UniProtKB/Swiss-Prot annotation:
The lineage of its organism: Eukaryota, Metazoa, Chordata, Craniata, Vertebrata. The gene is MT-ATP8. It is found in: Mitochondrion membrane. One of its GO terms (biological process) is proton motive force-driven ATP synthesis. This is ATP synthase protein 8. It comes from the Eukaryota.
Length: 66
């Protein structure tokens, strides 16, 4: 049974790493990064919960006949 020749493997691994780095750099070029991040004024919005949005009628328990 012949053995696998391992001599080209370091070159294959290095070229793969270089290619992945190159592809990553090309993909990062499409992103826009802000150089000076500005703080936005955040206004606090009060979110109403579901029970505040709709009117619910509270029923009394059924009265017992005497």
């Amino acid at each position: 049974m012949p053995q696998l020749d391992m001599s080209p493997w370091p070159m294959v691994i290095m070229s793969m790493i270089l290619t992945l780095f190159y592809i990553t750099q090309l993909k990062m070029l499409n992103f826009t990064f802000h150089t000076t991040p500005s703080s936005k004024l955040t206004m606090s919005h009060k979110h109403k919960t579901t029970w505040e949005l709709k009117w619910t009628k509270i029923y009394l328990p059924p009265s017992t006949y005497q």
